[in-house]
Amino acid sequence: MKLLNKIKNENAIEFQILIEKSEWEKKHKESFEKIAKKTASKLKIPGFRPGKVPVEEAKKHVNEIEVFETTTNDLIPQVLTFLEQDESFINDDSETVDTPSVDILDFKDGELSLKVVYDLYPVATIESYNDLILTPIVNEAFEHEVNAEIEHALNSKSQRRVKDDNEFIEKGDEVRFDFKGMIDSVPFEGGSAKDHLLTIGSNQFIPGFEDQMIGLKKDERKNINVKFPDDYHATDLAGKAAVFEVFIKEITNVKPQELNDEFAKSFNLPNVNTVQELKDYIHNQIVLAKQEKNSERAWLEIAQQLLAKAKITPIPQSLIDREVSTLRQQVLSQLSQYKIELKQYLEFSKKSEAQFQEDLIRQAKETITLALLVDDIAETQNIVVSDEEVKERVAEMAKLYQGEEQAVIEQLSKNPDAVKEFLLHKKVVNYLIDLNKNNQPKNTTLSSK
């Protein structure tokens, strides 16, 4: 076996290999014998029982094209081993894409010439990334947000009892009812609803509405007379008198949960034993949620600017095809969760299969480019992920699957590179956000949403 030539460009490395006559003949003989035995087991010839045809007889019926193809395919692993042990391959530090393609160049005088092509990973570069414009964001939890979560938690643990038909509405009750609003006997837009839920005393409705519901019983009807406030947000209703026909369907007595340390302990949260510790925990969770949401939003802004500034060498088709396949599978998986077929999705989106494929190709190229840029920035800025960080992340993810923690840990531990890639991406995004946090677009105000 000989290396005849090596041709390298920015997209690929091509190696031309010669399999000499002695090697070819040896492997050809092995292939011929193997195929002859297989042929003998299937061949039907008058005078011989099925499967009992002698191998020597079967050799007369062997398909030579099949032998040639089998010989070539059986030699390929040896060719790759030979090539990857050759100095011209070992000393080349180019990053190649997975398995190479192998094609026949020539077969002459009992010698086979093969072309082995390794696609090269593209190289993405960017001149600068400290001038990215980001919408300003404040990752802060406000008191009213914490109180709203506390109120929601209190309501979730309140004692509830559906009242009997002869019991009437009291302040604090939750009422399910239908209503129809009219002004001058004419219904107005947005003034009607069925099975609406209202806690009496919450002041969700206009002044006087809830007070007039007190004392009603299930299945009762009543006309409630109110006046929209002069400063009502819907200017066409502001200051006008209205009548609401209400029909009571269900009354639920709600015994509020008291906000105390026992309530705080009932959630079994780590290091939460008092009301203040519960509020601190909720505060931190709100901050973390905002950080995650704002990080995702910032990455969308960053990604578009990186793509606009980046330069990249041609992306091998094999890499694009693989990423397209992954993206397509992700779409199909998401659609299956909602029991939607791809054909239906394309109809909803008003896209053809060809347009859908074009979108996937564009997304694939962008995904590959961004991944290369993230890796390049990480290397340049010495951003790394330790094995300990991977273990911590695996443990965090396992906690989301109560009762299956160990199985999740074992599964994720089999592919630590995927976890490491996720964490590296997150670190690079946080680095870019911090680097560009003062680069704000003109005429913007801080937002905490």
Swiss-Prot record:
Provide the protein's localization: Cytoplasm
Q: What catalytic activity is recorded?
A: [protein]-peptidylproline (omega=180) = [protein]-peptidylproline (omega=0)
All residue ranges annotated as the PPIase FKBP-type domain in the record? 172-257
Task: Tell me which Gene Ontology terms the entry assigns under biological process.
Answer: 'de novo' cotranslational protein folding; cell division; chaperone-mediated protein folding; protein transport; protein unfolding
Q: What is its EC number?
A: 5.2.1.8
Q: Name one GO molecular function term.
A: protein folding chaperone
Instruction: Name the UniProt key words of this record, in alphabetical order.
Output: Cell cycle, Cell division, Chaperone, Cytoplasm, Isomerase, Rotamase
Question: Which superkingdom, per the lineage?
Answer: Bacteria
Described purpose of this protein according to its UniProt entry: Involved in protein export. Acts as a chaperone by maintaining the newly synthesized protein in an open conformation. Functions as a peptidyl-prolyl cis-trans isomerase.
What NCBIfam families does its record include?
A: tig
* Database matches in HAMAP family: Trigger_factor_Tig (MF_00303)
* Protein's name according to its UniProt entry: Trigger factor
